[in-house]
Amino acid sequence: MGISLWLCPYGHSPEYETFKTLIESLQTLFPNSPVFEPHVTVCSGLSCENMEEVHKVLEMAHHAINAVKSKVDSENALVEFDGFNIGKKYFEKCRLECKPNPMLYSLAKLIRSMFVGELNIDTWLFEEFHPHLSLAYSDIYPMDQAMIRLIRQRIEDLFDVTTEEIESHSRDQDAYKLQHTLKGWSFPLTFKVVRCEGPVEEWEVLSEVTVHG
């Protein structure tokens, strides 16, 4: 993954603490699963050779999100979730899926085009970009039905929502729909540029910026 841009709830906000609690709760179900902070990856594989370029990424993200701030309100959050997946792969083990949002897609497209140099940017955006909030990383597979029920129960209890299994678009994942959209977060929010290399415990936040409402 190299260097990535994360979109995070503001530290110690109610939203941050809620998602952090869920991540820590699910971690107890997966032996040796690392703890990490709540985040949605906007773009990975960024070309950042020095701190000046890291700061350029944050500056661009800051300006871009400020430009759409007027479109964000209590009825139109920047980050929302409408489903969750349980997968085979380590980094796809359990995650909340973001509800499609033009503002988030525009941000990802901008950062990808400027700091990755993607030639087929629209193909990447609509075929490979799947914004989500990871809840657990693990090599455990397969998972028995009792464990899956427990994961669903913890999500349902925390957010007071019911879940329904639906047909998945991937053989490697089981997909579930949430009865109603879960509000994630808007402002304040924090962008972080993170070096995602080696074990998760060794990932390093290179720099960050908080954007207030």
Curated annotation (Swiss-Prot):
Residues of the active site: 39 (proton donor/acceptor), 132 (proton donor/acceptor)
GO biological process terms held by the UniProt record: cyclic nucleotide metabolic process
A GO term for molecular function: 2',3'-cyclic-nucleotide 3'-phosphodiesterase activity
Family note: Belongs to the 2H phosphoesterase superfamily. CPD1 family.
Protein residues bound to substrate: 41, 134, 137
Catalysis performed (reactions): a nucleoside 2',3'-cyclic phosphate + H2O = a nucleoside 2'-phosphate + H(+)
Highest rank taxon of the organism: Eukaryota
Function text: Involved in the metabolism of ADP-ribose 1',2'-cyclic phosphate which is produced as a consequence of tRNA splicing.
Record keywords: Golgi apparatus, Hydrolase
GO cellular component: Golgi apparatus
Class of this enzyme: hydrolase
Protein name per its UniProtKB record: 2',3'-cyclic-nucleotide 3'-phosphodiesterase
Protein's cellular compartments: Golgi apparatus
Pfam family, one: CPDase
UniProt-listed Enzyme Commission number(s): 3.1.4.37
Gene: CPD1
